[in-house]
């Protein structure tokens, strides 16, 4: 459960470093939590109210939005695949939430689902 948001967050952090605009680890993880909540909603029907509250009331007002576009998705996916937590070759695994305090661990998601989560994250956070 400790890794909630980290698969996305570490990819955001690595991409920011590659682009020459490093962002603090905590900021990247905060945005990763929003992406993980989006994916939780898409995959596990986590309540949208929880997602919107975290995104709009907690993350967006206080953290600079990571600058990524859909052109960055292939690189973000590559970074996620190389994450040390993804032990199953080729699969990207996530800690997701069914609801507040009800986690699911090692939930696989395909590229299409991850891209959809990234699109929605960008919409929610104004990227």
Describe each region flagged by the PLM:
Residues 45-127:
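C-terminal charged capping/lid subdomain of soluble metabolic enzymes
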Residues 1-74:
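Active-site segments that bind and position negatively charged phosphate/pyrophosphate groups
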């Amino acid at each position: 459960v400790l890794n909630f948001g980290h698969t996305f967050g570490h990819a955001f952090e690595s991409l920011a470093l590659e682009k020459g605009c490093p962002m603090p680890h905590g900021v990247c993880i905060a945005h990763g939590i929003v992406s993980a909540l989006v994916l939780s909603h898409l995959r596990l029907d986590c309540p949208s109210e929880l997602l919107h509250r975290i995104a709009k009331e907690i993350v967006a007002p206080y953290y600079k939005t990571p600058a990524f576009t859909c052109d960055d998705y292939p690189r973000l996916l590559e970074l996620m695949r190389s994450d040390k937590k993804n032990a199953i070759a080729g699969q990207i695994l996530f800690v997701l939430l069914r609801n507040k305090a009800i986690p699911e661990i090692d939930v696989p998601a395909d590229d299409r689902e991850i891209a959809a989560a990234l699109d929605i994250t960008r919409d929610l956070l104004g990227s």
